[in-house]
Amino acid sequence: MKFHIIFCLLAALMMTSAFAEVTVEPLRHSNKNPTESECKKACADAYAKGDQSKIPEAHNFRDYYCNCHVIVQ
C-alpha cells in the first residue's frame, strides 16, 4: 500500500515542470549496478529522512548512485 501511494504521487508530479536534480548518498549494496527497485527505495528513503518540501519524481541509477529529480517548492 505504501508503494501505491508513492506511485500515485509520482504520477501527479509528472505533470509539473519545475524540477531540479539532486544526488542522494551512495547505495549501500554489494552490487555495483543496483536494480531499479533498489534505486527507487533509496530515493524514497532519502525523501523520508530529508526535506519534506522535496518529493521524489523520477529515478535513474548509475554506478553506486541514485539520482532523484525533485520538485522545488
From Swiss-Prot:
One of its GO terms (cellular component) is extracellular region. One of its GO terms (molecular function) is toxin activity. The keyword Acetylation does not apply. Contains 2 disulfide bonds. Expressed by the venom gland. It is found in: Secreted. Residues 1-20 form the signal peptide. Keywords: Disulfide bond, Ion channel impairing toxin, Neurotoxin, Secreted, Signal, Toxin, Voltage-gated sodium channel impairing toxin. Belongs to the scoloptoxin-15 family. Voltage-gated sodium channel inhibitor. This is Mu-scoloptoxin(15)-Ssd1a. It comes from Scolopendra dehaani. The lineage of its organism: Eukaryota, Metazoa, Ecdysozoa, Arthropoda, Myriapoda.
